[in-house]
């Protein structure tokens, strides 16, 4: 088995074949980032029928090449840049760095079965991740535009506009206003442009929510049955988690989301502190779910929270414990969703009968 490490860049990719038995380079090739050059790469790689590809940052600069190789039936591993840096520093020339060394380092990580993660074809979760990212960008742009509009209204009229400003209320506020100076006329024109921008953002956010709902129905997830999980949070959870089976346990997923406490132990002292690591967007989503459930008296989350309070824990500790509990619960539901989707039609019929 030969491992082909790839150091991807925007315009070029460098591939280095490594024999794991001896950890030696057996060949290297540099190509341009184009389909024609991809084909040249695969022809070069056919010299090793039993091969695995190890692409550094396959979710970033190596994304297109990784998907192209998957379409050909190749086995592709994603190698974090931090892992290649460690290998390069410890075993491949210290501070020396070039594309060939980086590619060989990626192959070495894959051969050692360290931080490598197998890349799979894209699924509905990837579509949800794209829509969620777009929604976040739209929301930020809308908030920024509303803030600009508030600034103009403060300059146009005493007291400015109400805090909860919408395109409709902003239009109504301008309707009876008569600018008296040249700068005020410009402010009114700019305000009308910003109102049009807000209206457009609202329409785009509405369309985005509709697309998310369709994809969630297609996915068949049961996350929306959990108190506090609506379409937007469900899309974020699925999109940023990807395949839940890549986490070996609920504890591993909790660590990934940053909801697992960090142990600080020395001699006879053992304490746990809040984790500042993990996927912070997933952490934020789980926090939102926890806070919603705490405010719902009949929810399972509120029962769990009250149990911790009854044990003498502080509200902050109880909230963190609920987040950790929710992370495990969410992971199990996503695992069940994945297993259900993997069943064949005959298995579904057999279970129903």
Write out the residue ranges for each language-model feature:
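Short glycine-rich phosphate-binding loop at a beta-alpha junction
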Residues: 50-61, 223
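Glycine-rich, often acidic, oxyanion-interacting loops/wings at catalytic, nucleic-acid
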Residues: 131-222, 349
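Acidic, carboxylate-rich catalytic segments that either coordinate divalent cations
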Residues: 296-353
């Amino acid at each position: 088995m030969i491992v082909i490490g790839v150091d991807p860049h925007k315009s070029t990719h460098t591939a280095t074949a490594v024999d794991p038995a001896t950890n030696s380079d057996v060949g290297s090739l540099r190509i341009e980032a184009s389909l024609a050059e991809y084909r040249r790469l695969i022809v070069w790689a056919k010299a090793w029928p039993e091969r695995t590809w190890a692409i550094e940052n396959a979710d970033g600069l190596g994304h297109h090449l990784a998907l192209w190789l998957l379409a050909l039936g190749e086995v592709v591993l994603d190698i974090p840049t931090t892992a290649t840096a460690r290998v390069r520093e410890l075993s491949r020339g210290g501070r020396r760095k070039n594309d060939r060394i980086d590619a060989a380092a990626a192959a070495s990580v894959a051969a050692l079965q360290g931080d490598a993660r197998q890349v799979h074809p894209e699924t509905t979760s990837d579509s949800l991740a794209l829509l969620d990212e777009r929604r976040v960008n739209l929301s930020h742009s809308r908030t920024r535009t509303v803030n600009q509009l508030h600034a103009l209204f403060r300059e146009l009229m005493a007291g400015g506009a109400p805090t909860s400003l919408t395109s409709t209320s902003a239009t109504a506020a301008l309707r009876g206003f008569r600018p008296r100076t040249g700068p005020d006329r410009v402010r009114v024109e700019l305000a009308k442009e910003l109102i049009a921008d807000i209206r457009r953002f609202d329409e785009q956010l509405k369309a985005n929510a509709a697309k998310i709902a369709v994809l969630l129905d297609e996915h068949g997830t049961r996350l929306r049955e959990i108190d506090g999980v609506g379409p937007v949070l469900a899309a974020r959870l699925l999109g940023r988690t990807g395949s839940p089976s890549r986490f070996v346990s609920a504890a591993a997923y909790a660590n990934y989301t940053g909801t697992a406490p960090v142990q600080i132990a020395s001699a006879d002292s053992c304490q746990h502190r809040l984790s500042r690591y993990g996927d912070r967007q997933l952490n934020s989503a789980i926090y939102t779910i926890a806070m919603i459930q705490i405010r719902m008296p009949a929810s399972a989350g509120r029962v769990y929270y009250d149990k911790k309070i009854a044990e003498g824990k502080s509200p902050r500790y109880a909230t963190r414990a609920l987040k950790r509990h929710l992370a495990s619960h969410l992971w199990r539901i996503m695992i069940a969703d994945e297993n259900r989707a993997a069943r064949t039609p005959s298995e579904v019929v057999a279970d129903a009968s």
